[in-house]
Amino acid sequence: LGGTLLTDTGTRFFLELNYDPHPLYHYANIPFKAGIYASDLSIDWGDGTSSILKEKQYFNIVHHYQQEGLFHIKISGHRISNLNVSRLNLVDLQLEHCPSLEYLNCSINELKELDLSPCPALEELHCNSNNLQTLDLSSNPKLMQLNASYNLLETLDLSLCPKLQSLYCSFNHLTSVCLNHCRDILYI
């Protein structure tokens, strides 16, 4: 269960989310796990502890909480290009000013909305297994791979994604899929 805010102004991004270690059974010590490719990460875990990770690399960040509760996590750093926040029970993900973000995996959450307009470099998106009713990809012309299966989508317009090569959109309520200008599509 949580809200997320991610900002990359070209030099620094910010990620905020609310995380419940185990919302159904309320067991303590269930780890928070996410993957981020960026540099100079600073993390406030929301439980009085923090971490600093230097260098530009892919970080598999893991934190074990010793108590139950809802934790407000703040992550900041430089030059984010890859973000994996799957399986975190997120209900809100807000991306702001992320011009270098190329890969986003926010699958298996509880998202109802996803605004990707601030991410023009996005090439691969996994937003499957959420509660998305709409998905606007008109600002993502570099998108090559999309997995939007297992949502509540009724229409999907990919006409402004001319580089799209693979599309997974099964198990939705789709009545219309527009693939105009998607000449590179290899898999539907």
What does each model-found stretch correspond to?
Residues 88, 109, 130, 148-151, ...:
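Consensus "Asn ladder" position of solenoid repeat domains
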Residues 1-102, 120, 141, 183:
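N-terminal capping/linker segments that flank leucine-rich repeat
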Residues 83, 93, 114, 135-137, ...:
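Canonical leucine-rich repeat
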Residues 83-85, 102-106, 123-127, 144-148, ...:
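Conserved hydrophobic beta-strand positions in leucine-rich repeat
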Residues 90, 101, 111, 132, ...:
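Glycine- and aspartate-rich repeat motifs characteristic of hemolysin/RTX-like Ca2+-binding segments
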Residues 96, 115-120, 138, 159-162, ...:
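C-terminal helix/turn sub-motif of individual leucine-rich repeats
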